[in-house]
């Protein structure tokens, strides 16, 4: 079973968000939440929320399908950050000049899944 959560237009640069996402990719969901809770990076808060949302989506899918749900079984099978739209702003500088400031945004995607049990032979 797979469940996905996407947060779009998050106001953090994709490079900084990728540093945080790389910490939790492949980990168990509960362990990932613990790592994100104490990570010092500012991008850890939106990633934490996306992981929580993916876990909740998995719970809803399990209830809908009538499957037993255990949060401890979930692992983060996919986690990636795509670049969102860039807001361009201008900073006034001396002698009538203006410097461009690029305020970057990110799209954060997290997929949680239950590992497939090996069939008995």
Swiss-Prot record:
UniProt keyword annotation of RNA-binding present: yes
Keyword Ribonucleoprotein: yes
Matches recorded under SUPFAM superfamilies: Ribosomal protein L22
Biological processes annotated in GO: translation
Cellular component GO terms, alphabetical: cytosolic large ribosomal subunit
Gene3D superfamilies: Ribosomal protein L22/L17 (3.90.470.10)
Keywords from the UniProt entry: Ribonucleoprotein, Ribosomal protein, RNA-binding, rRNA-binding
Top-level lineage group: Bacteria
GO molecular function ontology, one term from the record: rRNA binding
Known function: This protein binds specifically to 23S rRNA; its binding is stimulated by other ribosomal proteins, e.g. L4, L17, and L20. It is important during the early stages of 50S assembly. It makes multiple contacts with different domains of the 23S rRNA in the assembled 50S subunit and ribosome.
PANTHER family (UniProt xref): CHLOROPLAST 50S RIBOSOMAL PROTEIN L22-RELATED (PTHR13501), LARGE RIBOSOMAL SUBUNIT PROTEIN UL22M (PTHR13501:SF8)
Similarity section: Belongs to the universal ribosomal protein uL22 family.
Record text on subunit structure and interactions: Part of the 50S ribosomal subunit.
Name the UniProt record assigns to this protein: Large ribosomal subunit protein uL22
């Amino acid at each position: 079973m797979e469940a996905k959560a996407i947060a779009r237009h998050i106001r953090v640069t994709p490079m900084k968000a990728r540093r945080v996402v790389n910490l939790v990719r492949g980990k168990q969901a509960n362990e990932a939440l613990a790592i994100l809770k104490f990570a010092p990076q500012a991008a850890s808060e939106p990633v934490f929320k996306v992981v929580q949302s993916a876990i909740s989506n998995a719970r809803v899918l399990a209830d809908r399908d009538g499957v037993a749900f255990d949060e401890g079984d979930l692992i983060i099978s996919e986690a990636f950050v795509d670049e969102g739209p860039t807001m361009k702003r201008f900073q006034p500088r001396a002698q009538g000049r203006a410097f461009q400031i690029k305020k970057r945004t990110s799209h954060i995607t997290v997929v949680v899944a239950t590992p497939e049990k090996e069939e008995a032979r």
